[in-house]
């Protein structure tokens, strides 16, 4: 099933990641390294490299176990990305990385930090993207301005579901009792894929019904800039909430299913209830129900048309996908 577009299906086609340099990601942890402590912090720029592979090579270089290496998040492989790694080396001098050699990897900075960089401990990412072959038209400029003003669907995209949707397929088989999954990492990937699928379906349905920017009775609303949310129950004034939504003081959310999912809108409740096997699996695995904004606003969105195509620059908070924004701009041509 194709997910709905907030700004209608794009007219143009373009190539994404034709070259690594067409997709640049710069991590923002949201804090500075302390300069001292038990951890060696290494900032790298990697090109066409897997995050985990680079982390393993750094750990090998300094002679520690991969378990004592950390990073905030996995970055795209076919891209140029900058991110921090940390290496637990208490009581040891800071290594000299000038002799570290790995194709596609440059060491940008080495310092110390007082605690481990943990998965998920980042504020967001800066993106610079070239969409090759996109042409300047009135329609595309209007589309970009609409995305800047109204945002884009906060969908989970392909990387969340694995190659050819493998993680989702396995999650569904697991939920139906066809397979048993013992590997901890695989369990995590499959559960995340299942939750992401239900989230996407709820958001897509709201967009298809032209209700993705309207507060409904039962909606779960998130306060801007926080993870706190409240329900648009009978005590709440829907008109007042709609005004707050339009001022971007609050955000509409969709479910990340878990155990004890709170009732929401009729639309959401009906869609969630269609996935009983997944709900049972989530309860069995003690996954905590959560919420995620339906729409996302790209911060500092800028664009320029160049000879090769369309250049985009923007910032997204952690957990949102640049490819979800790109999907609203152009149809991506497969190489």
UniProtKB/Swiss-Prot annotation:
User: Per UniProt, what is one GO molecular function of this protein?
Assistant: tRNA pseudouridine(13) synthase activity
Residues in the active site? Answer: 76
* InterPro entries reported for this sequence: PsdUridine_synth_cat_dom_sf (IPR020103), PsdUridine_synth_TruD (IPR001656), PsdUridine_synth_TruD_CS (IPR020119), PsdUridine_synth_TruD_insert (IPR011760), TruD_catalytic (IPR042214), TruD_insert_sf (IPR043165), TruD_pseudoU_synthase (IPR050170)
Report if keyword Glycoprotein is assigned.
no
- EC number(s) on record? 5.4.99.27
Q: Where is the TRUD domain?
A: 151-307
Q: Which domain of life is it from?
A: Bacteria
Tell me, which GO biological process terms does this entry list? tRNA pseudouridine synthesis
Keywords linked to the UniProt accession: Isomerase, tRNA processing
**Catalytic activity, reaction form:** uridine(13) in tRNA = pseudouridine(13) in tRNA
| Any one GO cellular component localisation term in the record | cytosol
Family per record: Belongs to the pseudouridine synthase TruD family.
**Function of the protein:** Responsible for synthesis of pseudouridine from uracil-13 in transfer RNAs.
Instruction: Cite the PANTHER family for this sequence.
Output: TRNA PSEUDOURIDINE SYNTHASE D
The protein's name in its UniProt record: tRNA pseudouridine synthase D
Query: Where does this protein come from, organism-wise?
Result: Pasteurella multocida (strain Pm70)
């Amino acid at each position: 099933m194709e997910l709905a577009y907030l700004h209608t299906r794009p007219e143009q086609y373009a190539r994404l990641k034709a070259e690594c340099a067409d997709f640049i990601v710069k991590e923002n942890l949201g804090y500075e390294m302390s300069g001292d402590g038990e951890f060696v912090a290494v900032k790298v720029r990697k090109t066409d490299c897997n995050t985990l592979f680079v982390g393993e090579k750094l750990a090998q270089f300094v002679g520690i176990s991969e378990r004592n290496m950390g990073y905030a998040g996995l970055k795209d492989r076919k891209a140029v990305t900058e991110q921090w790694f940390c290496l637990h080396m208490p009581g040891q001098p800071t290594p000299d990385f000038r002799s570290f050699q790995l194709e596609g990897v440059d060491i940008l900075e080495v310092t110390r930090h007082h605690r481990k960089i943990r998965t998920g401990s980042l504020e967001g990412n800066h993106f610079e993207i070239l969409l090759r072959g996109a042409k300047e038209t009135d329609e595309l400029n209007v589309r970009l301005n609409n995305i800047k003003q109204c945002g884009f669907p906060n969908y989970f995209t392909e990387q969340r579901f694995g190659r050819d949707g493998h993680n989702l397929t396995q999650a569904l088989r697991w939920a139906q009792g066809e397979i048993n999954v013992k590997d901890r990492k695989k369990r995590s990937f499959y559960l995340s894929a299942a939750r992401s699928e239900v989230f996407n379906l709820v958001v897509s349905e709201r967009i298809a019904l032209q209700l993705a920017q309207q507060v409904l009775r039962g909606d779960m609303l998130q306060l801007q800039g926080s993870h706190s949310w409240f329900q648009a129950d009978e005590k709440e004034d829907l008109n007042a909430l709609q005004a707050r939504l339009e001022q971007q003081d609050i955000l509409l959310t969709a479910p990340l299913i878990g155990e004890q999912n709170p009732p929401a809108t009729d639309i959401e409740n009906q869609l969630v209830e269609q996935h009983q096997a997944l709900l049972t699996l989530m309860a069995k695995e003690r996954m905590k129900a959560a919420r995620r904004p339906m729409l996302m606003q790209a911060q500092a969105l800028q664009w320029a048309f160049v000879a090769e195509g369309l250049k985009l620059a923007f910032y997204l908070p952690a957990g949102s996908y640049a490819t979800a924004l790109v999907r609203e701009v152009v149809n991506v041509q497969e190489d």
